Amino acid sequence: MRNDPFQRLGLDREVLTVSQLNQRARLLLEDVFPQVWVEGELSNLARPASGHVYFTLKDSNAQIRCALFRQNALRVRQALRDGLAVKVRGKISLFEGRGDYQLIADTVEPAGDGALRLAFEALKEKLAGEGLFASERKRPLPAHPRRIGIVSSPSGAVIRDIISVFRRRAPQVELTLVPTAVQGREAVAQIVRALQLADRQGFDALILARGGGSLEDLWCFNEEAVARAVAACATPIVSAVGHETDVSISDFVADVRAPTPSAAAELLAPNAGDLQQRLDGLRRRLVLRMRDQLLRERLRLEGVARRLRHPGERLRQQAQRLDDLDMRLRRAFERQLAVRHERLVRLETRLAAQHPGRTLALLRQKLDSLAARLPRAAREVLKDRRQRLEGLAQTLNVVSPLATLGRGYSILLDERGRAIRDAGQTQPGQRLKARLAEGELEVRVEDNHRTPVTLSLLD
């Protein structure tokens, strides 16, 4: 015979087991509350494979766990979701295994939109009206960040997932965790302070991250204070709150929304293929620039050669200028090669961390070969121009008056240094200078016959 649940314990201090206590409590609750209607807001909705539905029904001050078994869940037409306001009919009971007080529901009816959803939509409309969601405000993420701040909880899988992605894709990126609570009463204030602190550290980008959870668990990211802190950040920020189906106010305000924290890391981790493509582009630009510079210098040297019209000092000046151009061109090549080589070394270091392997080695060999060939080509061109100049100098020397003097001829000059070309330009007794190949003679005109003189071609 079953004990009366309302029977008080005797004065002899009857001792109950935990199972007996929970059983009596369950019978008492089911007897007093065989059927009740309760209105509240759904949260922590769970649908296991059994077909049963478990959820929490709450208002602003309290909450109760509820169970809707499969045969009753099939009759519910309304799609249940977190934040939905409903009216639930059922009996109050107690799950003896855990001692949990609960409502066994048999009917669930909608009671209008939940308070959290209404608050979400109201804040979303307000901030959108202020332009905080506008695309013009969105800043692009850096293509190759060096330092990234992560605003998240220091414990849990989120930070481990983010670190794992960066170790795999971009181990050279420096990650800094700015710890904060992401759930609970203190979460909003801590998140705001963490964002303000991170924004002052000079990071290239920020990740605001949290794992999945119920609407209540994620609610701090729907608070106005957090949204305005995100909007105030001068640093580009990626919001990665919850799972792919979760959407928060911070997602709308941030520069980029990522469906998961791992996806946020993928967005900011440089891709090895992009770096390889950039290296190829730099190599092509280097080759084209060197060719262009070599062509300009060659044209310049040709112009110098065309302007060489006079012997002697003019020729020496141009030869000196050619030497100067040679040295400047060499220095320019060496300087450009040093700058490009240093830049390539930096890129190679970054690529080496991502194991590009044999492709990078082959590219480096090819680039070294090009770098070695360019100076040799420049030296060959300069050598050819120098030989042409020497040939011109020899030609000019052949037709030079000084060469004529060297064959035994002389040049007569009057007192003013003017050359005497005709005997009629002189007077008997006039003193003249005779310039020879080596030295000068003082001579005097004895007579000035204007008889034509025939010179031997063999002289």
Curated annotation (Swiss-Prot):
CDD domains: ExoVII_LU_OBF. Bidirectionally degrades single-stranded DNA into large acid-insoluble oligonucleotides, which are then degraded further into small acid-soluble oligonucleotides. Heterooligomer composed of large and small subunits. It catalyses: Exonucleolytic cleavage in either 5'- to 3'- or 3'- to 5'-direction to yield nucleoside 5'-phosphates. The keyword Zinc does not apply. Its EC number is 3.1.11.6. The keyword Cytoplasm applies. The gene is xseA. Belongs to the XseA family. GO terms for molecular function: exodeoxyribonuclease VII activity; nucleic acid binding. It comes from the Bacteria. GO terms for cellular component: cytoplasm; exodeoxyribonuclease VII complex. GO terms for biological process: DNA catabolic process. Keywords: Cytoplasm, Exonuclease, Hydrolase, Nuclease. This is Exodeoxyribonuclease 7 large subunit. It is found in: Cytoplasm. Its main location: cytoplasm.
